[in-house]
Amino acid sequence: MEEIRAWRHVFKLDPNKPIDDERLERLCESGTDAVIVGGTDGVTIDNVLDLLARIRRFSVPCALEVTDVEALTPGFDVYLVPIVLNSRQAEWIIGRHHEAVKQYGDMMNWDEIAAEGYCILNPECKAAKLTRADTELDVDDIVAYARLAEHLYKLPIFYLEYSGVYGDPSVVEKVKQALDQTQLFYGGGITTPEQAEHMARYADTVVVGNAIYDAFEQALATVAAVKQMAGQRNGDDGK
């Protein structure tokens, strides 16, 4: 999906967390490339629909990260489907996906759906515990998952998810070096524009989530930081 390939900065909103109208407006008009709606727990059709309706007052592209098929609804520009590559349970790799397609496959517009190959690396986060992710990985393990995502499974997105803690930029750099066509998303622990800029040196797309609720002004400042670094990278590529 070409529109996703253009994303450099993305905000992720949790439908189970409150955000007032004034902050939502500032976030949607901040210059971010997209807003992803998604969370690990407490995601319902009601809170997803409520957040979607509020975001739709603005022109920013809006994606739903599908973690619970019961909260699936029309109206989003893109549907992102996580495949947790380092999960110890098959349901997070293929099981839930099979069940969703079994129920709704006839109605799916596959042009609006993109799979994300997740590698969850924070053992304390809700997502790691829920999916029983094997987080005891060295950099070679992580790079191997990235290569599997691109070359074996042909996934359009590889998502390094540190969820709540700031990751190791050297790991992100090595993963980026291993990828050619697959787009590298990074999410986790970004609370300052400096951190966002650092990760944007390597990741194709930087996702900012928790800072929206914990450090809102800093979260907004990450947009310009990421865009500036993305511009520098594009300039370097053009030399």
From Swiss-Prot:
Q: Could you tell me the EC number(s) of this protein?
A: 2.5.1.n9
State the family it belongs to. Answer: Belongs to the GGGP/HepGP synthase family. Group I subfamily.
Q: Which domain of life is it from?
A: Bacteria
Query: GO terms for biological process?
Result: glycerophospholipid biosynthetic process
Question: What organism, scientifically named, is this protein from?
Answer: Geobacillus kaustophilus (strain HTA426)
Cofactor(s) needed for function? Mg(2+)
- Record keywords: Lipid biosynthesis, Lipid metabolism, Magnesium, Metal-binding, Phospholipid biosynthesis, Phospholipid metabolism, Transferase
Functional summary from the UniProt entry: Prenyltransferase that catalyzes in vivo the transfer of the heptaprenyl moiety of heptaprenyl pyrophosphate (HepPP; 35 carbon atoms) to the C3 hydroxyl of sn-glycerol-1-phosphate (G1P), producing heptaprenylglyceryl phosphate (HepGP). This reaction is an ether-bond-formation step in the biosynthesis of archaea-type G1P-based membrane lipids found in Bacillales. To a much lesser extent, is also able to use geranylgeranyl diphosphate (GGPP; C20) as the prenyl donor.
Q: Which InterPro entries match?
A: GGGP/HepGP_synthase_I (IPR039074), GGGP/HepGP_synthase_sf (IPR038597), GGGP_HepGP_synthase (IPR008205)
Which pathway does the UniProt entry assign to this protein? Membrane lipid metabolism; glycerophospholipid metabolism
The UniProt subunit note reads as follows:
Homodimer.
Question: Cross-referenced CDD domains, in alphabetical order?
Answer: PcrB_like
User: Which transformation does this protein catalyse, written as a reaction?
Assistant: sn-glycerol 1-phosphate + all-trans-heptaprenyl diphosphate = 3-heptaprenyl-sn-glycero-1-phosphate + diphosphate
Q: Could you say which residues bind Mg(2+) here? A: D14, T40
Q: Which GO terms describe its molecular function?
A: heptaprenylglyceryl phosphate synthase activity; magnesium ion binding; prenyltransferase activity
Residue ranges spanning the membrane: these are none
Protein's UniProt name: Heptaprenylglyceryl phosphate synthase
- Which PANTHER family did the record assign? HEPTAPRENYLGLYCERYL PHOSPHATE SYNTHASE, PTHR40029
Q: Which residues bind sn-glycerol 1-phosphate?
A: K12, Y159, L160, E161, Y162, S163, G164, G189, G209, N210
Q: Which Pfam families match?
A: PcrB
Q: Does the keyword Coiled coil apply?
A: no
